[in-house]
Amino acid sequence: MAANSTSDLHTPGTQLSVADIIVITVYFALNVAVGIWSSCRASRNTVNGYFLAGRDMTWWPIGASLFASSEGSGLFIGLAGSGAAGGLAVAGFEWNATYVLLALAWVFVPIYISSEIVTLPEYIQKRYGGQRIRMYLSVLSLLLSVFTKISLDLYAGALFVHICLGWNFYLSTILTLGITALYTIAGGLAAVIYTDALQTLIMVVGAVILTIKAFDQIGGYGQLEAAYAQAIPSRTIANTTCHLPRTDAMHMFRDPHTGDLPWTGMTFGLTIMATWYWCTDQVIVQRSLSARDLNHAKAGSILASYLKMLPMGLIIMPGMISRALFPDDVGCVVPSECLRACGAEVGCSNIAYPKLVMELMPIGLRGLMIAVMLAALMSSLTSIFNSSSTLFTMDIWRRLRPRSGERELLLVGRLVIVALIGVSVAWIPVLQDSNSGQLFIYMQSVTSSLAPPVTAVFVLGVFWRRANEQGAFWGLIAGLVVGATRLVLEFLNPAPPCGEPDTRPAVLGSIHYLHFAVALFALSGAVVVAGSLLTPPPQSVQIENLTWWTLAQDVPLGTKAGDGQTPQKHAFWARVCGFNAILLMCVNIFFYAYFA
């Protein structure tokens, strides 16, 4: 394990210029200024103001925040790394979000708003009754936040800074966490959403500049396929083919049996996982719940969906170019060569993006790209910090102290962020020892073992009136047992390195994690249905305004009092949103067909 430690990484000789330092300083100054400005605009002294931005956010910061929250530094490094390792197909994880984001705005948000909830476990408690499911989901969400989302983004961001600049790994981690937490604690959700909007702009501009320079290095887009096919390292392992780029690298749809990302799993399994992330996860849904009305929530989802089209060209293709330009480092397969290149024997695809930054970006622009990665890291972390504190405060603390006042709840919410920082920093050594070849695939594999049961409970709760608490609870437990079993087996039986036979159990070697997600969803759903049919039906109070079929028509999901909109204007913008949703799906289908 010591060989994989970050402390063993090669320290680059590149030093920051004065221009780079100025760019990074200006970035942080803008970030703090926007956070302070947005905090002054929103009321932070009420639970609704701190946790839901006073339910008065407009569509453009919501859309930008939805995008930025999902594009943390882990995704920047992970997507580029997976693109370098396997080609374009990983873009399906981004493009699939189009349909699920539309489902969020058109199906789930109306129900969440009409139920007058602040957190998603609160909705589950209203829909099913009882406290055990709500507590289960709150604790599970907090654990997932700490051990996957926060830790993964933190590790990837710190790895980027360490590789590019040679800064002390722990110092860069703690400083970034401290600044991130400062304006999250001070400003609540409004500060998070407005700083996300700023960081989205920085991320896109910086990534566009790097993409243009990367394509220029290989002679344009027309040369991408040929350049990638020739990205073979000079040192290989005899009698193996793992050093060769995939022959289907330019294909989105891959064979269900031999493909690394089979089209069946990317269509069905990924949709189940994406529904959990976009429609039932507190970090994401909280942004839509802050909308001033339903049209703004819909427009925010549409904007985020358009932005989710960009990573194919701005992250994944540059990752492929990085392997073409630096095959001995990014595409290494010999353990000793990988150890030299990035400090990890299992592979170095994760350094694809930072390698491009350090080799291609000139003085000044290098500082911009470092700011981009810091922006991605901080966008993701601020979102998770705020949403996790909301979960703990509203679902756990109020359960323990039902008489706690608003001042106490706000204080606890801020203290939870401090606690999350401590746990996350303590988890860094574990992540260092778990340094893997493809960070993004690891993240998705973990999600496939834990998310499908939650998706099943939410989907059945929304669309099936008969679903009750007993069925939902035992569906979650059955799914947790099966999913956790596979997860433990996966940690105990890692994939074999290049040139060694695969001796893992069949459930790991023969069943792709995306296919497993489908099976786990079906199992959990079957238990929910069986348990519900064998026990008494839910009470009417658990159905009214809480399912798609019983949503009251007179619930004020439209115009907000005092916003100056007439019913006619509201209906006009509703039609505009509907037209854009159809156009968006057409664009998405075109891209899928073009790269299929």
Swiss-Prot record:
Membrane topology, as annotated, equals: Multi-pass membrane protein
Which residues have a glycan attached per UniProt? 4, 96
Q: What is its main location?
A: membrane
Modification type Phosphoserine: residues: 141, 145
Q: NCBIfam families in the record, alphabetically?
A: sss
Please give the residue ranges for the topological domain Cytoplasmic: 37-72, 121-149, 195-200, 286-300, 377-409, 465-471, 535-575
Give UniProt keywords alphabetically.
Cell membrane, Glycoprotein, Ion transport, Membrane, Phosphoprotein, Sodium, Sodium transport, Sugar transport, Transmembrane, Transmembrane helix, Transport
- Give the modified residues of type Phosphothreonine: 148
The protein's matches in InterPro entries, at most eight in alphabetical order, are given as: Na/Glc_symporter_sf (IPR038377), Na/solute_symporter (IPR001734), Na/solute_symporter_CS (IPR018212)
Name this protein carries in UniProt = Sodium/mannose cotransporter SLC5A10
A GO molecular function term, named singly, is: fructose:sodium symporter activity
Pfam families, alphabetized: SSF
Instruction: Topology check: give the Extracellular ranges.
Output: 1-15, 94-99, 171-173, 222-264, 322-355, 431-443, 493-513
Q: Where in the cell is it found?
A: Apical cell membrane
Q: Which family does it belong to?
A: Belongs to the sodium:solute symporter (SSF) (TC 2.A.21) family.
Query: TM segments?
Result: 16-36, 73-93, 100-120, 150-170, 174-194, 201-221, 265-285, 301-321, 356-376, 410-430, 444-464, 472-492, 514-534, 576-596
Q: Which top-level group of life is the source organism from? A: Eukaryota
